[in-house]
């Protein structure tokens, strides 16, 4: 130990100190953001002299590394750290995350909420999913190519200041969707053994879901990919059982085809929900490919992710729409829906007068599928928090992951009892930012950078070299006005959205993206001209 005035330093032999797993020595010192210098002893041996703050932070990294948890945060992943060359890992990540009850329930909105028949619902599901998922696959390529997390990459794409705003929105979105997903699964678990007096309380259901999420997200990238590679299997099996029981019930009918302005409005509103779900992973995308080597074929990454996203989204949502059509044709199933939404329909299909005990077991498995959907939320929330503000990057990723899970648990329990409807409406509103983000990011890459060589990785945290974000922030604000005018929700219908059909139609995504695109491409050339970045 070395004392100098009121400062306390610890001296460590350079040759005896090895980098922490998932974090280089250089990055570890940079994160500490404290006084660090080298010293030379009388025998010419060099030492690193660090303040006690840096030493304490180093201890945290070493502790988490000893548990085999990923300690690397938002700093760029170097080429020698890129050891994940599995295309299957990239594809299965999103395959499992979407083979879940949340996407199944979303597909049911077509018939249940928007009054579309089965055929119309299927067409909307396919078209709007494709529109959304291609951006997730596209930005996943950036992770392997540049080694940057999505919110750090955003500093280049939307501007440094604007990226911080999107990071904040992303933190809210990660926790918010975790709350909504957890509440749905907790309600389904609560239905198991209904009437026996031995049911799973709502709070316990939330604790089970969050506990499972913590076990995986704590360890980081490698364990997440290992879990997601296989977690789709039991979920897929249960969905096959639902198909079998739905077919045996004979309650499914396709419904009549109806046209007109009101139907058009319903198509747009349902499509808006579908697009938001499929594109929802866009602001997470690069986080799950950063450890893939730069030499990995970009087309393989893109098309494998398109397939890994498309199949589970099409499959679960179409099945959800079919289940909803059946529920509309049966008063008992409809009563289950009115009481417990699509969780109630799942229970009605699998348990009473059906598979009984085995059906309840299937309900438990499907409720646990939410863990696979929550994992990306709780991993990315940590990286988004670190990207928000430099001092927050000092806090290890593992700590942020635990904090995100704790916040999700703390809010999901009262939300399930008292304001789950409010949470769903709130998250629907948050989702509109995706279209604005996509419009700005694609403009920057295709019009102004045009190739990966235009991204200087060394500038990832350099305020002097990164785009300021004047154009990006202006586009975000104007795009938000477009969203407000075009959205059609139960709590708000915009002046333009209300003009479509009897009940209005949601074109918030379309207006938000188009207005942001126009403003950004007017202001970005001026920003480059006067600021040079």
UniProtKB/Swiss-Prot annotation:
The modification Phosphoserine is found at residue 18. One of its GO terms (cellular component) is cell periphery. It is found in: Membrane. Residues 120-121, 219-256, 321-347, 419-465 are extracellular. Residues 1-98, 142-198, 277-300, 368-398, 486-533 are cytoplasmic. One of its GO terms (biological process) is cytosine transport. CDD domains: SLC-NCS1sbd_CobB-like. One of its GO terms (molecular function) is cytidine transmembrane transporter activity. There is a cross-link at residue 16 (Glycyl lysine isopeptide (Lys-Gly) (interchain with G-Cter in ubiquitin)). The chain crosses the membrane at residues 99-119, 122-141, 199-218, 257-276, 301-320, 348-367, 399-418, 466-485. Keywords: Isopeptide bond, Membrane, Phosphoprotein, Transmembrane, Transmembrane helix, Transport, Ubl conjugation. It is a multi-pass membrane protein. Disulfide bonds: none annotated. Residues 165-184 are annotated as: Surface seeking. InterPro entries: NCS1, Pur-cyt_permease, Pur-cyt_permease_Fcy2/21/22. Not N-glycosylated. This permease has a broad specificity towards purines, and also transport cytosine and 5-methylcytosine but neither uracil nor thymine. Present with 23600 molecules/cell in log phase SD medium. NCBIfam families: ncs1 (TIGR00800). Belongs to the purine-cytosine permease (2.A.39) family. This is Purine-cytosine permease FCY2. It comes from Saccharomyces cerevisiae (strain ATCC 204508 / S288c) (Baker's yeast).
């Amino acid at each position: 130990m070395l004392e100098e005035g009121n400062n306390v330093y610890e001296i460590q032999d350079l040759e005896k100190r090895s980098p922490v797993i998932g974090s280089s020595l250089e990055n570890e010192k940079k994160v500490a953001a404290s006084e660090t210098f080298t010293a030379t002893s009388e025998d010419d041996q060099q030492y690193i002299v660090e303040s006690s703050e840096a030493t304490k932070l180093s201890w945290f990294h070493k502790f988490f590394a000893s548990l085999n948890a990923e300690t690397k945060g938002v700093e760029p992943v170097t080429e020698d750290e890129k050891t994940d060359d599995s295309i299957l890992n990239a594809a299965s990540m999103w395959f499992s995350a979407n083979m879940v009850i949340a996407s199944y329930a979303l597909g049911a909105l077509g018939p249940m909420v928007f009054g579309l028949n089965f055929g119309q619902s299927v067409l909307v599901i396919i078209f709007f999913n494709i529109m959304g998922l291609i951006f997730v696959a596209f930005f996943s390529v950036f992770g392997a190519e540049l080694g940057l997390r999505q919110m750090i990459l955003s500093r280049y794409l939307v501007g440094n200041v604007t990226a911080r705003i999107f990071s904040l929105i992303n933190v809210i979105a990660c926790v918010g969707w975790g709350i909504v997903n957890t509440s749905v699964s907790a309600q389904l678990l609560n239905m198991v053994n209904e009437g026996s007096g031995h049911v799973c309380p709502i709070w316990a259901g939330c604790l089970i879901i969050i506990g499972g999420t913590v076990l995986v997200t704590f360890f980081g990238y490698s364990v997440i990919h290992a879990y997601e590679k296989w977690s789709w299997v039991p979920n897929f099996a249960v969905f096959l059982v639902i198909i079998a029981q739905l077919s045996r019930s004979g309650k499914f009918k396709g419904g009549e085809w109806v046209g007109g302005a009101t139907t058009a409005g319903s198509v747009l509103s349902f499509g808006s929900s579908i697009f938001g779900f499929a594109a929802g992973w866009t602001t997470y995308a690069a986080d799950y490919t950063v450890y893939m080597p730069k030499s990995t074929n970009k087309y393989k990454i893109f098309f494998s992710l398109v397939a890994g996203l498309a199949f589970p989204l099409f499959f679960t949502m179409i099945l959800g729409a079919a289940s909803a059509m059946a529920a509309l044709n049966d008063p008992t199933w409809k009563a289950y829906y009115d009481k417990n939404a699509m969780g109630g329909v799942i229970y009605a299909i699998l348990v009473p007068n059906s598979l009984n005990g085995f059906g309840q077991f299937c309900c438990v498995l499907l409720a646990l599928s939410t863990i696979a959907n929550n994992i990306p939320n709780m991993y990315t929330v940590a990286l988004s928090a670190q990207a928000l503000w430099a001092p927050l990057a000092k806090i290890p990723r593992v700590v942020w992951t635990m904090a995100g899970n704790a916040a999700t648990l703390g809010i999901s329990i009262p939300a399930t009892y008292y304001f789950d409807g409010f949470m769903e409406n709130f998250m629907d509103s948050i989702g509109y930012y995706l279209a604005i983000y996509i419009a700005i990011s694609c403009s920057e890459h295709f019009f102004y950078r045009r190739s990966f060589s235009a991204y200087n990785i060394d500038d990832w945290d350099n305020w002097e070299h990164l785009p300021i974000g004047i154009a990006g922030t202006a586009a975000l604000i104007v795009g938000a006005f477009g969203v407000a005018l075009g959205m059609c929700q139960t709590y708000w219908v915009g002046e333009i959205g209300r003009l479509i059909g009897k009940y209005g139609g949601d074109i918030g995504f379309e207006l938000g993206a188009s207005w942001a695109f126009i403003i950004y491409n007017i202001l970005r050339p001026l920003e480059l001209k006067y600021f040079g970045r």
